Every structure is written in structure tokens, then in C-alpha cells.
Amino acid sequence: MAESGEALGTVPEHERILQEIESTDTACVGPTLRSVYDGQPNAHKKFMEKLDACIRNHDKEIEKMCNFHHQGFVDAITELLKVRADAEKLKVQVTDTNRRFQDAGKEVIEQTEDIIRCRIQQRNITTVVEKLQLCLPVLEMYSKLKEQMSMQRYYSALKTMEQLENVYFPRVSQYRFCQLMMDTLPKLREDIKDISMSDLKDFLESIRKHSDKIGETAMKQAQQQKSFSIAVQKQTNMRFGKNMHVNNDRTLEEKSDIILKHTLEEEAENDEEVLTVQDLVDFSPVYRCSHIYSALGDEETFENYYRKQRKKQARLVLQPQSSVHETVDGYRRYFTQIVGFFVVEDHILHVTQGLVTRAYTDELWNMALSKIIAVLRAHSSYCTDPDLVLELKNLIVIFADTLQGYGFSVNRLFDLLFEIRDQYNETLLKKWAGIFRDIFEEDNYSPIPIGSEEEYKMVISKFPFQDPDLEKQSFPKKFPMSQSVPLIYIQVKEFIYASLKFSESLHRSSTEIDDMLRKSTNLLLTRILSSCLLNLIRKPHIGLTELVQIIINTTHLEQACKYLEDFITNITNISQETVHTTRLYGLSTFKDARHAAEGEIYTKLNQKIDEFVQLADYDWTMAESDGRASGYLMDLINFLRSIFQVFTHLPGKVAQTACMSACQHLSTSLMQMLLDSELKQISMGAVQQFNLDVIQCELFASSEPVPGFQGDTLQLAFIDLRQLLDLFMVWDWSTYLADYGQPASKYLRVNPHAALTLLEKMKDTSKKNNIFAQFRKNDRDRQKLIETVVKQLRGLVTGMSQHM
């Protein structure tokens, strides 16, 4: 039962498999058949049985179908057999017709072949003509290219190459000759680049050689333009200036018209001679090279090369020769080369596009300007000649004006000119120091003698001197100053003129120029003239008379300073009402010189007194005085009287101070002589002789050698000596010791130390001269008194030391 159940379940499965085999592609039969074997054991046998049964069923159906169509097939075969004879007939007819057609078409075929052959030839000819018409323009353009190359029309040649490559070659690119032509174009381009670069190098070398001439031409044009502007300005100032005199208006206008006319004539003559930069340099190579590299699409290479080479040339131009500072021609050559360089760059800037830009030229100029300033600052420091420095300044101004006309900033150059101006002033100061020294060396330091009205007017024309009393005097007469005063005044004015020459054309206002001139003049007065005066005053050969004249000279020079201020105001055309921040320091300069001269007078006077005092030859052990003053002292007093007579031309205080100083110094010298430590013994006779000399000094002081002293002021210079000598002459020790320290003391000016020193010298003398005097009562009493006084004086000296 189990087996029968399984068999019943297998049968539907086999039917499904058979249906699948019949309905699917044979490529998929394998998996279907595998499922038969994957089933129950002996399933494939049952499947085979089922398959055989299925095959038998299909055979039966085929047999049934064949039986059904068999009669129709037989009828069809019978019909075919009937039409076979007709088909044979038709074939024979077709073959015959074909043969007759073939025979008839042979001639047509031959004629047709001839026609075809002619048509092919005609087509080929047409094609050749078309191709030749296509190639001829290419060949003509290539021939044109060769002609342009031979005629050195390289930019046109490049344009022709572009046309060949973009228009003509694409039309005939299939031909071999086209490829050959195309292969030659890169080499032609390289040749053009090399040739144009060679031309550019020649151009760069040419402008390097012509920089001098280009710069000289540009600077000449700028100078002519400036001269014309100055002439017009001067004419305007002459016609409309505030300081013109009405009576001279017509004359000034006529002169200004003549000046302007001459300037215009010179301008016209120079214009005919002056060449432009285009006349001096052929710029076509740089134009061609620029166009060629632009056409080649390599503008950057060309620009970089040009700028690199020009920067190298700029460095060479900016490097001056070591001897540039020796002559003005060296500076001129240096400036013209630089101007020529930047004039060329400015021209290139305006005639090309992109080769040189304003930013590039400004950068190059700033680099050059820093180098120029460093060079000028270094080399100008070697210039010791003010004329050379002035010419250098004029060159720098023309140089700056020229480049400013081309749009370059030159403010730093004018700032440099202010530095050079300081150096110029230093060279001027050195030069005028020599001039002043020569004037002082040649001066005789005596008042200027005048013998006639002409001589008087000549001096007045040189120096602003006004003295109504002197004018009233008859000839011959004398100016109070010496001949150096008008010469110094003239030279100060010459210095101002020289300083003004540098200040011109600095693009500064009249007020600024006026201020600069005043500062320069102050330097001349305070540094140079003051130094020369001080050196003169300190020279050993300058005596008291010369010193007195120097003081008088400085007084008149000081008074002339206001005229120098007016002179500066006039030449700078500044209004008198303008408040000047800078004044001339003549007052302090000449006051210092006078003080130095006064001090030197005091010093020399004291030295002269010392010389006389050194001639003193006292016999310090003499028993009695000679009864008359010493000869050296009388000579000294006579000398002082003559000197103080010369001092009458000095200001009162100076003469009084000199007289008081001389008396005080004489008193001090006499006191030092009396108290000299090397002097061991002094007799009473020597003291009496010394007293006679002091009396002469007091008489001299009381004679009023210099007017202006009140009462016995001058005699007070000898008060210390007088009281000391009176103390010893009267031997009034009791009064001195009793009144010491009292304001009303008779011997208030006697110093205990001085009294002690002199008393000890006399004590030693008494001991030496009176060896046996101790046996006499009076001498013993005197000796005891001296010893007692000495002890008391020593006590006073000790008390003074402790108090101090």
C-alpha cells in the first residue's frame, strides 16, 4: 500500500517534468533531468516509462497528420511535373534574349568606357585646378614671407606666419609641401627673436653711450626754460615790486624789457641748436622688438630682459668715479648720465604699452635717488672749495628741475641741498676765517687818518659811521676805529652775498631765505669772527695799545649790526614790518670779545707790573732808608700814567676797572714781596724804604689817573699795606692787640698772620745785629716786647685757624 501511494505521488511529478522539457530550451534540460535523479530510488525508470508512453502518443499524432496531408502533396508534385516543359522553353528564350542583348551592348560598353575615361580625366583636371588654386595663395604667402625676411620686415613676417598657420595651411594641410613649410616656421620665429634681441642689445648699448648727450640736452633745455622764467619774474618784480622808487620806474622797465629781449633771443638761438631725444637715439629697435615679442606672445620675456638690462645700466650710471668730487665736470658728467637714463625711460614709458610702467620708473627712480643722495652726501663732504660746492648746488638744482619736468619726485634732492648748504656754509666760514685773520694781521691798530673830504667819503661809503662831532672837525682828522673795521664790515656783506647765492633756486620763500641768511651770518659772527677776535686778543705780540683799539673796534662793529640786518632785509626783498624770528647776535659776539680784550688788558697790565716789580732790588738789612722812592717803582708809576692816558678812549668803567685792577695787583705784589718766605730778615730801615715806595703808590692813586673814581676809592687798594706799615713804623702793638676784631679798629685791615710773619723777620734781624745788645736794658726790653707780641700774634693766628 505504501508503494502504491508513492507511485501515485510520482506520476504527476513526471508529467510536470515532461511538460517542462517540451516547453523549455534544450540548454535548460539538464537541471530538469537532474531533478529526476535526485528523487526516490528507481524514479528514473518510471520516468523513462512515462517518457516512452509520451513518445508513442506523439508518433501517433504525426502519423495521423501525415495521412491527412498526403493527397495534397501528391497533387502538388503532379503540377510541378506539368510546368517543367514550359520552364525549359522559357529558359531557352531568356538565354537567346540575353545573347542578343550582349551582342548589342558591346559597342555601347566600349563607348561608355571611353566616356567614363574622359569623365575621369576631366574630373582629375578640375580637381588639379582646384587644388592649384588652393595652393597658389599659400605659395604666394610663403614667398611673401621669404621676401619680408630678406627685407628685415620681421613684424610683418610674423603676421604673415600667423595668416599662413591660421588661414592658408589648414586648407592644404594634406600636402607634403605644406608640412615642410610648417616645419620651417618655428626656426624662422627663433631667427626673428634672435635678430630682434640682437637689435635690442645694440639699442641698449647705443643709449648707454648717448646718455651723456641726452642728459646734457635735457638739462640744457631745462636751464633755458628756467632762465626764461627767471627773466620774466624779474621783469614782473621790477614793474610791480613794492620797493620800487617812482622816479626810476621807467628806467627799470626799460632795463627789464632789454633783459627779457636778450633772454628770448638766446632762447631762440639755443632752440635751433638743441636736439630732442629722438634726434639723438633711434628707438625703432625697441619698438620692433616689443612688437615682435608681443606678436610671439612672449612679452613677459622681453619686458623682463629689458628691465633687467636697464637696471644693470642704472647701477653702472649711478656708480660715480672716485675722482668725481675733484672738479665740477665730474659732477656734471655724473648728472647728465643719470638724466639721460631717465629721459630715455620716460620716452619709452610714453611710446610703448607695458614695457615700462609708471610704477616701474618710480621704483627705479627711488632706488636711484637713494644712491644719488648717498653719493652726493659722501663725495660733497670732500669739497673744501665753496665755489665748487656752489657749482655743485647749481648742478643739483638743474638736475632736479630737469627730472621734475619729466614727472619724477625730487623733494629729497632739495632736502639734500639743505645738508649741502650747511657744508657750503662751513666752507665759507673756513674761507672767511682766513680772510678775517689776514685783515687782523695787516691792521696797524691805530685810528684811521683822514686828510681830505674824498678820503672821508670813501670810508663812509664802506662803513656806516655817523659822528656829528667828527664831521665838524677840520682835516686832517681821525676815525676812532682802525682800518680793519670797514674791511670786516665789507667782508661780512660779501659773506652774506655768497650765502645768498646758494639759497637762490631752492624753491624757498623770501622769508625762509632771509631767515637762512641771518642764521649763516650769526654763525659767521659768533663762531668765526668771535674766534678770530679771541685768538687775536690772546696773541703775545698784541700789546695794551692794540687791545684798547680792539675794544673800540668791536664797539663800532656792534653798532653796525643793525645795518647788516637792514642789508639782509633789502637783498631778500622782505618787508620792514616782517617780524624776524632770527636776529643777528652781534651784541653778544662783540660784547664777549670786549670782555676778553678787557680781561687780556688786565692780565697784560698785571704782567707788566710784575716785570717792573721783578726789577726791585731792596737791601732788606739796610739801617736807614735812602729818603727817596725806589727807581723801579717810579718807572712803573710813569708807565701806568702813560697807559691810563691811552685808556681815555675806552668806556669809563673799563678804564676804571683796569686802573683799580692794576693798583690792587701792585698792592698784592708788594705785600707778597714783603712777606716772601724766602726773605728771612728785614730791618727797620728796609721797612722805612718800603714805606716810601708805598707812599708813591698812594700819591699815584690820589692823582686820579683815570677819571670817575669817587673820593679815595682808588687809594683803598693800598689800605692793607698802609695799615701794616703804619703798625710797624709807629710800633703801636698795644693798640692793635687791644682793638683787634673791633669794627672801629685803627688797624682793621692788618692780618695777624702777615703781622706775625713780618715781625718774626724783624726779630731775627734784631738778634743778628745785636749780639751784645742783651747786656743793654732797652734792647732787652724791646726784645722781650717782640717776643711777647709774637706769642700773642700766634695766639690770634691759632684762634683764626680754629674758627675757620
Swiss-Prot record:
Subunit structure, interactors included: The exocyst complex is composed of EXOC1, EXOC2, EXOC3, EXOC4, EXOC5, EXOC6, EXOC7 and EXOC8. Interacts with CNTRL. Interacts with RAB11A in a GTP-dependent manner.
Pfam families assigned: EXOC6_Sec15_N, Sec15_C
Similarity field: Belongs to the SEC15 family.
Compartments where located: Cytoplasm; Cytoplasm, Perinuclear region; Cell projection, Growth cone; Midbody, Midbody ring
Role according to the record: Component of the exocyst complex involved in the docking of exocytic vesicles with fusion sites on the plasma membrane. Together with RAB11A, RAB3IP, RAB8A, PARD3, PRKCI, ANXA2, CDC42 and DNMBP promotes transcytosis of PODXL to the apical membrane initiation sites (AMIS), apical surface formation and lumenogenesis.
Cellular compartments per GO CC: exocyst; Flemming body; growth cone; perinuclear region of cytoplasm
Entry keywords, A to Z: Cell projection, Cytoplasm, Exocytosis, Protein transport, Transport
One of the protein's GO biological processes: erythrocyte differentiation
Protein name as it appears in the record: Exocyst complex component 6
Gene3D superfamilies (UniProt xref): Dsl1p vesicle tethering complex, Tip20p subunit, domain D, Exocyst complex subunit Sec15 C-terminal domain, N-terminal subdomain
Main location: cytoplasm
Paired cysteines (S-S): none
